Every structure is written in C-alpha cells, then in structure tokens.
Amino acid sequence: KKLVSKYLKEDKSEKKKFKPRIKARIRKNKQILTKNLDNFFDWIKGAELVELKECNTDEDPVRPELDNNFRRSYGRKIYGVKFKNEIHAVMCFAYTNEIPKSVDELDMLSQDAYLQSTLRGQIVGKIAIAYTVWSKKKGGGKLIVKEVFKKIKKSNHLNRLVTLSPLTDMAYKFHSKNGAKLIQVNETTQNFEYKVPK
C-alpha cells in the first residue's frame, strides 16, 4: 500500500508540473498563430491591383516561354498585386472575341480583336482571357483573381472572364476553388469561366 501510494503521489506531482508546460506552449502557439493571421490580413487589406509594364517571366510557372513583348502587344495586359512596393502575384491577359484553345490561337485571336478595335474606338475584345497566373505569397493567387474580377465587372466592354489553363490538376483545383466553371477541355489546355454578373 505504501509503495502504491508513493507512486500515485509522484504521478500526481509530475502531472502538476506537466500541465503548466502544456498551457505555456498552447499560449505561445496561439500568439504565433494570431501574429501570422494579422500579418496575412494586413497584406490582403493593403494590397492593390496595378498594371505592370513587365514581369519576371522566369517566375512564371505556367508559360515562361512568353516574353514581355508578347505579354504587352496587341492590347494584352500584365496585372500585379502590389503590397509595400513589392509585387506578390501576377496575372496576364489577352482580349479576344472568341475563346482560344491554344497559345497560338490566343495570339491570333487577340491580334484580330486588337485590329478590329481600331474601328471601334480602342475597345479591344469582349472576353478577357487570363492565360497565366502565379503568386509569390500565400493568398496572392486568390486575391488577384478577386481584384481582376472586380475590374472586369466595372468595365463597359468586357462581359466574360475565361482562362487558358494548362491540363493540370493544380489548375483545375485552383480555378474550381475560386468559383470558376470548367467550360471545355482542349488538346493541350482547358478553359474555365468566371461568371461576370452585369
């Protein structure tokens, strides 16, 4: 009995010592988590969508072969999410009147829409085609989609936001998670559409 009671006493004292350690660790983890969440929301709230003259094409995981000249000619645009003078996410667009199934088609259709725009007072295409997007900071991809979506809703001539995405699970998950619907699967690409309510 004495031996049992001795071990029970030791066990209780160990539990008492152990509990404050757990509480301290939980408290510290909560502080770290709160700080990380605050930092995350600070950057999300303070970020802005800007038009870029160029981007680092080596950072583009989707279409690094397309140079800045391609990305800026025939009315094509490069947008970035800027926070504290740093670009954290990039999305490249072309404007067309039809949905392309490949980069070559995108090039041809955006040139055609651009040439037609000279007759229409510089209104280039009715469909915004997002052909590449990448992020250097967590939440950047989702944020740039949201900001571009707002910009398209405000525009007078754009009525659709469609992607020209690679045939990867990552692209499927990203666009599906952000509210886009898969509209067609092509030989080397897939197109998703974000509904633009007018």
Listing of model-derived features with the role each one plays in the protein:
Residues 2-52:
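Conserved N-terminal entry element of GNAT/NAT acetyltransferase domains
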Residues 92-128:
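Conserved acyl-donor/pantetheine-binding loop and adjacent beta-alpha core of acyl/acetyltransferases
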Residues 135, 162-173:
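Conserved beta-strand-loop-alpha-helix junction that forms the acyl-donor binding cleft
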Residues 137-153:
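Conserved acetyl-CoA-binding loop-helix of GNAT-fold acetyltransferases
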Residues 176-186:
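Conserved acetyl-CoA-binding loop of GNAT-fold acetyltransferases
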Residues 188-198:
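C-terminal "cap" of GNAT-fold acetyltransferases
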